[in-house]
Amino acid sequence: ALNAPVLQEAKAYERHIDIKWIPQSKEDIKYYRIYRSFDGVTYQPVAIRRPWMNRYTDFLGEVGKKAYYKVTAVDYALNESNDSQTVSATTYPMTDEQLLDMVQEANFRYYWEGAEPNSGLARENIPGRNDMIATGASGFGIMAIVAGIERGFITREEGVQRFLKITSFLEKADKFHGAVSHFIDGTTGKTVAFFGPKDNGGDLVETSFLFQGLLTARQYFDQENDKEKQIRRSIDSLWKNVEWSWYKQFKDSPYLYWHWSPDQAWVINHKLIGW
């Protein structure tokens, strides 16, 4: 039998409520079913969530509206677990500052909770491709995690553990004269030529976005303990090994070039100009 989900919180904003539960083993779960009540007595199903999801956002469209929630797990034979415990929250008028906090925390959660689990980096949001990471977006996510630590959304130690995972993965991932590809398989570290066979090597734009985030993290983790020293050493090694001058293609070129392929060289031949 499936265990009842454990609800962690219901958090209200001006016109919607977020609920969150502890994820369970996914093998036997087809989906989670969310129930809502406005009186705490009569509940109606309002949504389902796939087993890899552990949040639901309920848009009520009103200020001052209280709602109660329960969640169940449903298996592939459509057997349903017992109800979770009940959580409730009430929407309220938000200040501009509270609105900005809400947006910032949601942005952080996208990268923190939605990361590819083996690498800790940002997934490319393509249906059916749960293990493909986007390196440029990962740079944005790295900055979001640093902000999340500073804002208290997670602890510094939680952030440190994530960055040890990220840097360890990147050290082993495919690189092309130090640069990374646009897409990487999060389970193997191998390049994914998603845009076609010519796009199977270094991508200097995505590399730049990634390293902007990494260098931000390198400066942020400045404590003199073994873990933060390791993060700094790893990031130093990664960025110092990027051969930016290689991507000029020609010695006297005034331009950098976007792509380089290990078997087709400069076949795309795209100059980085006009920016």
Where do the protein language model's features map onto the residues?
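Pro/Thr/Ser/Gly-rich low-complexity, intrinsically disordered linker/stalk tracts
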Residues: 1-28, 63, 75-94
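Recognizes extended acidic, P/S/T-rich segments that occur
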Residues: 31-64, 76-83
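Extended, well-ordered alpha-helical scaffold segments
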Residues: 99-111, 154-171, 217, 223-245
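Well-ordered alpha-helical scaffold segments within catalytic/enzyme domains
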Residues: 94-95, 139-154, 169, 209-224
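Membrane helical hairpin/interfacial module
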Residues: 131-139, 143-200
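Low-complexity, Ser/Thr/Pro/Gly-enriched N-terminal "stalk/linker" regions
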Residues: 92-133, 177-179, 183-184
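Extended ligand-binding clefts on enzyme/binding-domain cores
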Residues: 97-102, 177-208, 223-275
